[in-house]
C-alpha cells in the first residue's frame, strides 16, 4: 500500500485518500499552476496510526523521508542542512473542510545552527529569527502541547521591558532573546529536555501531531455538528515554505474562484502586505 503521494501523483478525484487540500493541490499542480511543491501523507496512514496504538510504522516513515528527498531535488535545498535549509509547513487536510479545527506548523526545519545559515542565505537576520521564534512557539503548542499563552506572555513581557507596542518593532537582537526565552519555556515544560534540533525528529513529531489533532476536542465537536464520520481520519500536507514575513514585498492573503457569499463565478479574495502588517499589527496568520 502507498501512503505518501507527491502533489504531481494525485488529482481532484482522490479526495478520500488525499483529503480536500491535498487533492486540490495535486489538481492545481497538474494544471501547471505555480504551487509550492510538496507531498501528502494519506488518510489511510492516519487510520494506520490509530490502529497501531498512535504510532507511525517504519514503512510510512520511510515513505515520508523518500518524499522529502524528492522535494529536496525540486527545491535545490537539503532538509536539515545548516547553511541553506529546506523549510516546510505541515498542515492537516481532511476530506471534508474543517476550517480552524486542526493544527498547522510553519518553518519546520529550523534549529540553532540552521537559523544562522538561513539568516546569511536570505541576508535578513531579523526575518530568520522571527521565523525561528514562530516555529518554536507553534511546535511547542501543537506537538508538545505547551500552551501558547506561555509564549504570548513572554512576548508581552519583552515588549514592556523594551517600551514597544508591536511585535514588528522587535529588532534581531530582541528576537534572539525571544528565542532563548521560548526555548527555556519548552525545556521547563519538558522536564529539562531541549528543543529538538534534528529536522527529521521535528517532522515526524509534526505529522503525529496532525494525526492526533483529528481527535482533539474542537475537531470532535465540529465533526458531530457537521455529520463527519470519525473514522475518516485526516491527511497531512507537507509543503515547501512560502513566507509572509520576509519583507516589504511579502504578504498574506486568500483567493476564491467564486464569490464565497453568492457563488457567482469570478476571482475574489483579499490580501495584506507585510508593510501594512507592520503598520497595523493585524492578527492575520503569516504563512
Residue ranges and their predicted role:
Residues 1-278:
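Nucleotide/phosphate-binding sheet-loop regions of phosphoryl- and nucleotidyl-transfer enzymes
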Residues 276, 281-287:
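Single conserved hydrophobic/aromatic residue that forms the stacking wall/gate
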